[in-house]
Design a protein with these regions (language model features):
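An aromatic- and glycine-enriched ligand-binding surface/loop that stacks and positions planar moieties
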Residues: 1-143
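Extracytoplasmic/secretory soluble proteins
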Residues: 222, 231-232
Length: 243
């Protein structure tokens, strides 16, 4: 229904609203704590509708920690294992978050990594302070060229650069295992935002659309100080990205 115009050439926003209403009649709720959806044992979440289920014992399981964390991050986070120091968040995406929104720190690992035994910033093998930055700065002289010999913006960066994934809680005491956290494909919050988008696009009940989006924002901030007066399509779509 949401992509009807793309598939059959005409929108079906009314159908979106009807299907969302049917789902909202079920036993699912918006969890009071956003982070419940990303905890180690998030199978307790009453918001998650369709998850990918994982166990630490899975041969090929949830390996987010391996993909994203620096080699020394486990020393700070309280577990062991060989990290790959790979995936970082795109800086522009990180900056779409309001730094006052708890989902900012709840989604990204940014800033100095402090050794819990000394209280000092950890050092990389190159002697740099282990400080995860938002931006990835290409080291001068390492820029790559394209097929025509022109310099590109691509090149080597320092191993500590880049915001790391912090959305799913890392279990303290993990020892060279996969993560237990399930990954939600759909949550009730997504249904709220889909219904809100459909209402805005069809020129429907903007009051209801605003209420739905604000329910997600209030849950995130813990108060109504950041509520929208009348939600726009851009604001709904941004809420979906931050969700």
């Amino acid at each position: 229904y949401l992509n009807a115009e793309e598939w059959i050439g005409e929108p079906n926003w009314k159908g979106v609203v009807e299907q969302c209403d049917e789902i909202m009649k079920l036993e699912y709720i918006i969890e009071p704590n956003w982070k419940t959806n990303f905890e180690v044992h998030n199978e307790v979440s009453r918001e998650i509708i369709l998850p990918i289920c994982y166990k630490a014992s899975d041969e090929w399981g949830n390996s987010i920690h391996l993909w994203t964390l620096h080699y020394l991050d486990p020393d700070v986070l309280g577990f062991t294992g060989g990290m790959w120091n790979g995936i970082n968040a795109q800086p522009d995406f990180v900056r779409t978050f309001d730094t006052e929104d708890p989902r900012y720190e709840g989604s990204f690992l940014i800033g100095p990594m402090i050794d819990p035994s000394t209280g000092e910033i950890l050092k990389t093998t190159l002697g740099h302070d282990l400080i995860h930055t938002i931006d990835l700065n290409v080291v001068a002289g390492t820029e790559k060229t394209d097929a025509d010999g022109n310099l590109t913006p691509w090149g080597e960066v320092h191993q500590e650069d880049g915001a790391r994934i912090n959305k799913w809680v890392y279990e303290k005491g993990m020892q060279n295992t996969n993560m237990e956290n399930d990954i939600a494909i759909f949550r009730l919050a997504d249904v709220y935002l889909m219904k809100a988008e459909a209402l805005v696009r069809m020129g429907g009940d903007l009051g209801e659309a605003t209420r739905l989006v604000n329910a997600i924002r209030e849950r995130a901030y813990g108060n109504s100080d950041h509520n929208y007066t009348s939600v726009t399509l851009d604001e709904d779509r941004k809420s979906t990205r931050l969700n």
